[in-house]
Amino acid sequence: MSSIDLSTVRTFLLGLQERITHAIAEVDGQPFMTDHWQKEPGETLQGNGITKILEQGRVFERAGCGFSHVRGPRLPPSATQHRPELAGAAFEAMGVSLVFHPRNPYVPTVHMNVRMLAATPVGENCEPVCWFGGGMDLTPFYGFDEDAVHFHQVCKDSLKPFGDDKYPRFKQWCDEYFYLKHRQEQRGIGGVFFDDFQELGLAQSFAMMQSVGDSFLQAYLPIVERRKDSLFGERERDFQLYRRGRYVEFNLVWDRGTHFGLQSGGRTESILMSMPPLASWSYQRPNEAGSPEERLYKEFLVRRDWV
């Protein structure tokens, strides 16, 4: 099919999942529960995966990191909206996706995903096509410039070997993607995001995906260590739960990954592990002028050049 051996991609993804969950468990002090799953014969999707989840830890209220490798007879609409020529194509997809919801409101929520998708177009003598996607983004509840700068600098450094254009392109893509249109609001401070990517050739495109995945711990752990023991009270916890509601709204209304999983017959329990354990909504919640909560909206939930 290509110069990419799918077993090589799978081995990398499984190793990445293991490295990340080991490091997070070390910080938290509680191990991840591991759930090996297999799609049942006769289901639309076939394949398997490993869901690792940590709940009610010391640092993380919920931290989920999932690997999946599935095959299906027909790409769902969410995967073909930018590639209409692949409508009806059989496909194979694998990836690692994580969302970590910290307990302390001063520690930001984080999301990271790296994935590969291969599809065989309908028709005679059609060559299979393969592409990569991925990225990471940070969603603070209380904004700190040094955290945002650090996160974006690591993202930029991970992409530098693949061209100076990649970080600004993928940062803009991230800002545009993680936007709640119905709220006219950014989800967080962004990061980098790319999809349907093969322009460097398959080997280098895979290498770029690897670099992004490998840089995750360097981007996130220093922020966790800096904020996890900060003192907080009921006010900060209440605001954290309110802002988590926005995370839920984005994932269920706008996220292509969630839609892809649900439309293709994916494993619902694993797809929805990105949901926070608790969230809240209140009607037209005001923010006190000059407060840290107002500062989040004015200075952090806006598109900015952090590096």
Swiss-Prot record:
Pathway: Porphyrin-containing compound metabolism; protoporphyrin-IX biosynthesis; protoporphyrinogen-IX from coproporphyrinogen-III (O2 route): step 1/1. It is an enzyme of class 1 (oxidoreductase). Its cofactor is a divalent metal cation. The active site is at H111 (proton donor). The keyword Cytoplasm applies. Gene3D superfamilies: Coproporphyrinogen III oxidase, aerobic. Residues 247-282 are annotated as: Important for dimerization. It is found in: Cytoplasm. SUPFAM superfamilies: Coproporphyrinogen III oxidase. Substrate binds at S97, N113, V114, R115, G265, G266, R267. The record marks H182 as: Important for dimerization. It catalyses: coproporphyrinogen III + O2 + 2 H(+) = protoporphyrinogen IX + 2 CO2 + 2 H2O. GO terms for molecular function: coproporphyrinogen oxidase activity; metal ion binding; protein homodimerization activity. The keyword Oxidoreductase applies. One of its GO terms (biological process) is protoporphyrinogen IX biosynthetic process. Keywords: Cytoplasm, Heme biosynthesis, Metal-binding, Oxidoreductase, Porphyrin biosynthesis. One of its GO terms (cellular component) is cytoplasm. Its EC number is 1.3.3.3. A divalent metal cation binds at H101, H111, H152, H182. Belongs to the aerobic coproporphyrinogen-III oxidase family. Involved in the heme biosynthesis. Catalyzes the aerobic oxidative decarboxylation of propionate groups of rings A and B of coproporphyrinogen-III to yield the vinyl groups in protoporphyrinogen-IX. Homodimer. This is Oxygen-dependent coproporphyrinogen-III oxidase. The gene is hemF.
